[in-house]
Amino acid sequence: MSETLSNIVSKNMTNDKNSLESMNISSSSSAEENPKKQAKKXKERGPDPSANPFHLSGDVDFFLLRDQERNKALSERQQQKTMRVHEKMTYSSKVLAKHTSLRRQLQLEDKQEDLEARTEADHLRAFRDYNTWKLTLTKEKNVEPENMSGYLKQKRQMFLLQYTLDCKRREIQRLETLATKEEARLQQAEKSLAKDAALFDEFLRENDCSSVQAMKAAEKETKAKIEKILEIRDLTTQIVNIKSEISRFEDTLQHYKVYKDFLYKLSPKEWLEEQEKKHLFLKNAKEISEASKDGSVNSTPGDKGPGIKGKASSVWAKEGQGTKKPWRFLRLGRSLSYLSSPQQGSQPSESSGGNSRGSNSPIPLTQEDTDSDGEEPQLYFTEPQQLLDVFRELEEQNLSLIQNRQEMEETLEELSRTLKHTQIRMDREVNQLKQWVSTMMMSITKEEDTAAELELKARVFHFGEYKGDQQDKLLESLNWKVLDVYRNCIGTQQEANLGTVQMLTIIEHQLDELLENLERVPQVKIEQAERAKEKERRIRLREEKLQMQKILQEERLQRARARAQAEIKKKRGRTLVCRSQPPVHRIKQESEHTLMDKEKEELLFFFT
């Protein structure tokens, strides 16, 4: 019995041990899983200030969340106002960014869940391996009996585990009650939101009604405004039409005034003087009548003389006033008849044009004076034929003047043409004479040079025939010339009171050296030097020619000035001219000094 009891107790202990181990493993696994879940909840809900992990966070307040979202939207709106264009984001880009962030978070959560599932599978696999290993080890082995202390220890552990389970159940119940309370609170908040939505809908309805009324009132006001604008437009068109008619009438009035001035200018002076006298007489009579009227008003009833004068003046004034209005109507009728029938408006236009303007007329009779005097203004031309006669006379005068002017122009053109031809001929002759003078001067200078050379040669050939003084002078001049050549060719460094012959020998040696060097110089450099010398010679000749031309121009100007200042000699009668003789045929003679001229040119070319 004892053996059986011990076997049973040992079996129970082993079972209890296995159960305890399984509970420990499950508790350990649950303990490992709980921190992960708590960490996950803490990640989802945020940090909890209290130490109790089963306490609800403050983020559950939906009203607070709504306020936070509203403040966040306001801050984002203010930030959008301050941001630049390239820094702003559209709604689609924001939504895409949110979607990408949510997708990334979901991917991370999926990865974490996969890792957790893998770890749990690894734990289960290890536990299964451990149980199988334990069964294989304990199989067919005698299990040693355990003592009471181990058994009590196991029971204590079981009790503690049961206690923890009860605590967790109570905490779960408490959390469920809190969840029900929060759900009730949320339902109440939903009801308040529904009430707020109903109030907001009512406000929107009232706002729509007020906006409809405002739109109707605005439409009425716009209709009234459009009607007023149309009325104003009609009135403005009428004003513009009236102004255009006024301007048209003013233009016609100006035309008539121009015609009137023209007719007054064509009228004779005697008639104008008569009209001026008549106007002055009427003006004086009017002044006398006004003065007599004033005297009759101020006089007593017994005074008959002044009263009679006042009556006469009043009758005169009435007649003037009576003739004033008909004249105005007559003028208007004439203008209308001129506008209606232009083909019959020659005489009426003349009369109305002559009567429409008097301010710019050459006589003192004006339109205001005629209106004030009450009499119709008169014109000298009563028939168109009179005006045509005046036109014919003026046309004849103009034709005669035009003919005289044409004759004068023809004579002037002939004179200018002859003057031009004579000027051209004189200029040509002057240029020819100048060329002849220049050629003669050049030939004279050449002849003088050749004569001087011949004279020098003759003196040299006839050296013994001259006297000693002349020879000394000639030798001295020759010495000076040789010295000048020596200084120009060799310089003043080697000059030490040399004689003429010595200087000539030195010049000859220098010339030989130069000729030898010249033979050694390449042909290209010689050609360049020749070109340079030729260019200098041409420039010098051009300058001399320009100087000669300037001198000739000055002489010509002096002669012209003297000719202009001299007295004009009037030729009387024909000039005596001798008979013309046939021209003499001159034979051209070749100059004997061409060789000498060539030598001079070579000397000038190479030694200047």
Swiss-Prot record:
Pfam families: DUF4200. Residues 1-17 have a biased composition (Polar residues). Its main location: cytoplasm. Residues 164-196, 230-257, 385-435, 500-575 form a coiled coil. Residues 1-57, 291-320, 339-377 are annotated as: Disordered. GO terms for biological process: cilium movement; inner dynein arm assembly. GO terms for molecular function: dynein complex binding. InterPro entries: CFAP_domain-containing, DUF4200. It comes from the Eukaryota. GO terms for cellular component: axonemal doublet microtubule; ciliary basal body; motile cilium. It is found in: Cytoplasm, Cytoskeleton, Cilium axoneme. Signal peptide: none annotated. Residues 20-32, 339-361 have a biased composition (Low complexity). Keywords: Cell projection, Cilium, Coiled coil, Cytoplasm, Cytoskeleton. Belongs to the CFAP100 family. May play a role in ciliary/flagellar motility by regulating the assembly and the activity of axonemal inner dynein arm. This is Cilia- and flagella-associated protein 100.
